[in-house]
Amino acid sequence: MSMKLAPGDPIPSVGLRATDGYLLNLRSWVTKQPAVILFFGAPTLAGAARRKGANAIEALAAGFDRLREAGIAVAAVSTDSEQQQTDFATSQKLPFLLYSDERRSAVEMLGIETVAKGDNVNVAQPVAIAVDRDGIIRAVIERVEPVALVDQLMRALSEPIPVAAEDATTSS
């Protein structure tokens, strides 16, 4: 599966349940302020895949204050259950909410790759999405490098969206 959305596309409307029990509509939430959404697998994964997800979450948690001070909201999403999310968020002492996409509606809509082991389905590798206050995707980071993640996201939300080559030729 490849990403179905790209920079310049609107973030779709999809409902997700948070670790605090709150139901979030992704589209409505991002139109309040710029936002960063990390799709990850970790709570119920094992091995290298779990480490990738956990490292991405740790990087986002470490950069949370910088993002918040810049007025950027932060959330993370996995396909685990609300209870698994709550347990993971508590054990990691995360400063932001996790959202459960247990039905996989968001990952399917966005085209985020998943892996299955029996009934356990997880995000295959972390994917970060930066969305501006108009609900427009500014960046999709499919190969998350934890050390550079926060800088990449902040840069994506501070720079104008580049004009696509085909758009540039039609506007002349």
Indicate residue ranges for each PLM-predicted region.
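Chalcogenol-based redox active-site neighborhoods
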Residues: 1-172
